[in-house]
Amino acid sequence: MASRKLRDQIVIATKFTTDYKGYDVGKGKSANFCGNHKRSLHVSVRDSLRKLQTDWIDILYVHWWDYMSSIEEVMDSLHILVQQGKVLYLGVSDTPAWVVSAANYYATSHGKTPFSIYQGKWNVLNRDFERDIIPMARHFGMALAPWDVMGGGRFQSKKAVEERKKKGEGLRTFFGTSEQTDMEVKISEALLKVAEEHGTESVTAIAIAYVRSKAKHVFPLVGGRKIEHLKQNIEALSIKLTPEQIKYLESIVPFDVGFPTNFIGDDPAVTKKPSFLTEMSAKISFED
């Protein structure tokens, strides 16, 4: 990047929080290089700028919430980096919605930089993200960068799985078995059915299109080791799922949004349907 002088054409996002020095200083000796505290942030950004050979980071994420640093310390420290021009935008990952909400309210009420993007686990099989994270992001105007959108590569059609086995390639896994679970098989079959309705066999493209159809400003984190993977990722950009297709995919694995949403309902500005409690008072309609 530096040698080709492409910095201004590239958006760089990186994170801090996870220990990145344990291998160097020794196990159990890297408390200064882990966590959300100011010291961890300082050394992490210092070293990231050096390694990336750049003067600034476009998006800096809090990687995960450690529950040991105060919201005030974290947001104050991050804002200093923005003021210094070392960071342009702030993101947060794998953190409870209540923490992000409190952090953004603190930042905006004190003239500091709030989080503008949230990164977390979300796919058609695991929809916990939809309980609090999406409504929170909608409220604050935050973008969403879901990871694990393709189920860690485990959303595969039966044909694709058999082809991988013939080549001696199993499904990638960090925990558990390399075989698909029953739920992964079912959702993969459903994704393939929808894919065929769009004239493709790409389960991956439909999995990506699903999250992009569910909310605004969704930028899925995608990967791949082959050119064909990249092509499937790009193919998703031209696919728009219908409400019926979304409903079908969501019928495969039941999802309970939980209390209080399953009691009072979702935001009528989104659903266009008022709470039954509201309708007890009068007939109210919500329009676009």
From Swiss-Prot:
This is Putative aryl-alcohol dehydrogenase AAD10. It comes from Saccharomyces cerevisiae (strain ATCC 204508 / S288c). It comes from the Eukaryota. GO terms for molecular function: aryl-alcohol dehydrogenase (NADP+) activity. The keyword Oxidoreductase applies. Belongs to the aldo/keto reductase family. Aldo/keto reductase 2 subfamily. PANTHER family: ARYL-ALCOHOL DEHYDROGENASE AAD10-RELATED, NADH-SPECIFIC METHYLGLYOXAL REDUCTASE-RELATED. Coiled coil: none annotated. The keyword Transferase does not apply. Its EC number is 1.1.1.-. One of its GO terms (biological process) is aldehyde metabolic process. Keywords: Oxidoreductase.
